[in-house]
Amino acid sequence: MQTYPMPTQAVILAGGLGTRLRSVVRDVPKPMAAIGERPFLSYLLDECVRYGIRDAILAVGYLHETIQQYFGDAYKGMRLRYAIEDEPLGTGGAVKQALRYCPPDMPAFVLNGDTLFATDWQQLYQCYIQQGADIAISLRTMHHFDRYGVVETDSTGRVTAFCEKQYREIGNINGGIYVLSPLLLCNYPDRFSLEQDVLSVSIQHYRLYTHVSESYFIDIGIPDDYRRAQTELPQLFE
């Protein structure tokens, strides 16, 4: 199978307030929640390094100084830059602002800052190229769940529907890693939701394709999973 050079830019949405985590994590942005002796965000940056990212742009807002002071302008040889939200821009607005640091004609990876999905970025990017996708979306197969909505696709992997949360025996959820071009968001307003204003309403307008995996996935957005991350992440990724 032909392979293509990987993007070297990634955006991480690191501006989360961590509202649901306040019972166990206080006074830091959600991606800075401690996992053992280091912040959750460092695990995401390790994934970036592993896949050859040379330039990571952190979309930050709430207590952004905490992140900047901890990580500075580099991480394991990878340049770090910060796209600071002075007011909440939504996930789409935050991504759009951060992508201004990237070459407009080069695709970039985009990651949620409160989930870690150990899917294969190379395969996700191959999907983006080979399908001529506007956006490639990582999907995680889940079993017996009601916490997430599901993404339905056709036999080629193209998205046909985003479905609301309800109990399901099995389904594919959005894993929170994307490939897209900065040009895609140029005409959107400064404040919008990537999920609600782009993905959910653009199935007919954009070519949304998917790569499905059952690789390790964790969402630290609720206390129970955050506690689980304390043991699982050091065991799996140290």
Task: Kindly label every feature range from the protein language model.
Residues 17, 28, 63, 216:
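A generic "binding-loop/recognition-motif" signal
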Residues 23-26:
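Conserved catalytic-core motifs of eukaryotic protein kinase domains, centered on the activation segment
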Residues 106-109, 116, 122-129, 143, ...:
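Catalytic-core segments of class I nucleotidyltransferases/pyrophosphorylases
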Residues 147-160:
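Acceptor/aglycone-binding surface of glycosyltransferases and processive sugar-polymer synthases
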Residues 1-12, 20, 34, 38-112, ...:
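Conserved N-terminal catalytic core of the sugar/cofactor nucleotidyltransferase
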Residues 15, 61, 140-141:
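Histidine-centered beta-alpha loop that forms part of the nucleotide-sugar donor binding/catalytic region
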Residues 32, 150-153, 199, 210:
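A structural signal for short hydrophobic beta-strand segments in well-ordered beta-sheet cores
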Residues 131-141:
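A short, conserved acidic/glycine-rich loop-to-beta-strand motif
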